């Protein structure tokens, strides 16, 4: 799907609407992180709670915004807590296609209004993942992941 260079994350996600129409749910992830998340367990969790969206919650180094949770209910977001106390958006989602209705167009950022509306509307749950998760936002992180792959010790390679 050609989303165009200037399209924000929400607009990119909205472009898959025709492909997921009629489905009960679909999976979405960002392209800048790797994990050994059990996708089947995440889908099962999503189906069990009956909400529109599930986000994976992970504990990273303390350089990301954090999810505020009451149990598994996402109630808000905290920008970059110190240390690694908070759970963050791990970037792996299970979504009901109706989530796409919350996206206005190409200038919508998925992480802003759509996710906030899902959280405040009690339609977002967090699946806590305690295994391997690593972003690739810096050269250092890219090198770390490439070294893991080259060594044969890539925890995300589950096939």
Region roles according to the model:
Residues 66-69:
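Active-site and channel-lining beta-strand-loop segments
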Residues 24-29, 34-35, 39-47, 59-62, ...:
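Catalytic-core segments of class I nucleotidyltransferases/pyrophosphorylases
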